[in-house]
Amino acid sequence: MNPYEASKKIESLCRLAPVIPVLVVDDANIAQPLAEALIKGGLTVLEVTLRTPSALQVISEMAKVQGGVVGAGTITKASDVTDAINAGAQFGVSPGSTDDILEACEQKKLPILPGAATSTEIMKLFNLGFSVQKFFPAEAVGGQSALKAIGGPLPHVKFCPTGGITYQNAKSYLQLQNTLCVGGSWVAPKNLIENKDWHGITNLAKAASEILN
């Protein structure tokens, strides 16, 4: 899967809902009900970050839930790509971009949403064929004003900004012409996960899925 094909696949996923939940899950036993709650609320594309020992098992469990598309986030090395695929991930997300990660994704045919924070990084990825990128860490590197400015000289690159995105500021990102969707953790906060408040998470997901209405 070359970069052009990867970006086409990622773009189709980004257009399924305005928000991709960025999930940090410690307990694989709650993976399925968490996924079901988010999907019920209208968020069907789920990013499970590889930040916990159980993350790969969480991906495997969430992949069993109908109606969702589960990917692996926080891919930081080539071996993560193989592990993610073996766990059942259908796409990958990286905070930054290295040759090793991009090559592994191409060889293993895993669509990747590669991370970039500067115009130079964005241009390098675009020249490789990645027309859809993760803008990270969005708020820390200038937020919506920076992303809007980048769209001037680089109008053909589309983004999923992530990092510091909240329900309160998500809409202003989504109204930018170069933003396809946003990544956010607010739809599945730690306290609701720990309390197994699936109804509460569904409500947050529903509000996020309807944020542009």
Report the location of each language-model feature.
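Glycine-rich beta-to-alpha transition loops that act as phosphate-gripper elements at the mouths
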Residues: 24-27, 72-78, 94-97, 114-119, ...
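Histidine/lysine/aspartate-rich catalytic loop segments that bind and position anionic ligands
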Residues: 95-132, 136-141
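A charged, well-structured terminal subsegment
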Residues: 141, 150-153, 201-202
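Conserved N-terminal beta1-alpha1 strand-loop-helix module at the mouth
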Residues: 1-90, 107, 156, 167, ...
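Conserved beta-strand positions in the central sheet of alpha/beta enzyme cores
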Residues: 22, 47, 71, 93, ...
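Glycine-rich phosphate-binding active-site loops on the catalytic face of alpha/beta enzymes
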Residues: 91-101, 134-144, 178-200
